[in-house]
Structure formats: C-alpha cells, structure tokens
C-alpha cells in the first residue's frame, strides 16, 4: 500500500485543507506535527525552498503548497471529486482559490496592526468580503451544488477569521454587512466533512491569543 505522510501544524488552515482532502478521499496517512520553532530535518529536506507546512509525502516524494497538494490528491486517489468535472466550473474554482490566496496576508495582517494602519487593513478586508458576498448571492457554495475546491480554499475566512475576531477583539464580519457570506460561513462550519477535521475552537483561541500577546510584547520591548 502507498505510504502517505502529512507534515503540518495543528493550528494551520493550510494543513487543515490537506487533512480534509485526505479524509474525503478515504486515504490513510501518518500525520506528523511540526514545531514552528524547531522544524524537523524531514520538513527542511522536503520543502527546501519555503521550509513550511503543509508537506504531503507520497511514496517518498514530497508535494508542497496546500492547493497544489489538493489537486494532487484529487488526481491521484480514488473517491469523491474535489475539483468539478466540468472544465468551466474547474476554471471558476481555480479562480476563486487564487483570489482567496492573494488576500490571505491582508486578512491576517489586519489583526496585528493598530490605529490608522489597522483601519486601512480593515478596508482592504471589507473590499474582499464585499466581492465574496456578491458572488455567494443565491448560492450555497462557490461553485456548483456541493462543497468543493473553492470552499476549502476559503477555510481561513470560513473558520479561522471568526477565531481571530474573537481572540483579538476586532470584528470584521456581521450578518447585516455581509449576509450571503455569513450564510455561507454557517454552511461551511456545519458541513460534516469539515467539522470532522477542524481543530478545537477553544484551543485555537488560546493559541492565537498567546501569539498575539507575544507579538505585542516584542513590539513594546525597549530596543
């Protein structure tokens, strides 16, 4: 039987994408938790360019970058399709995946800014949410009638964003401002396939609050 290993961080939305795909396909795998501050030689050898997770190792061969890994899993293993079969729908799914990937840094960085810089960051995130809200009008999922590639690409805004908001005390999403996105987010969180692989919300809150405090302390420390 093919050997499959996944190197990841338990708190990472990018690791979660791969876990979701493997479970959807019914692939048995060994999960290896990495230490952010002391990365293993296996990780550094498997991803020498970026030195980051997730990394999927299949029969000794490493595949990196979460959305690339998802396509690899979809093409390699039997089971339900992750990408749509229709070429146009596949293109749409890849478009929204790229759009969301380009916005990840803006979403995360907003929580580590203060004052005017944070307000600028919020506006950038609001613009992204407006686009998503408009796209999700009268739609249950991003592409087609089932949860798929584009939806899992949106996992950071689907679940982690809410954790960041609560942990850092910065509210970006309300059902009044973004009703369609909020409805989709509820669908995302309650999707049985997703719930099975999501980390504990309470543990994530504790982890990110501690990280936030550490960042603030380092910024405030005398030089």
From Swiss-Prot:
GO annotation, biological process: auxin-activated signaling pathway; glutathione metabolic process
Q: Which family does it belong to?
A: Belongs to the GST superfamily. HSP26 family.
Q: What is this protein called?
A: Probable glutathione S-transferase
* GO molecular-function terms, A-Z: glutathione transferase activity
Which residue ranges traverse the bilayer?
Answer: none
Annotated EC: 2.5.1.18
Q: Which reaction does it catalyse?
A: RX + glutathione = an S-substituted glutathione + a halide anion + H(+)
The source organism is: Nicotiana tabacum (Common tobacco)
* Residues covered by the GST N-terminal domain: 2-81
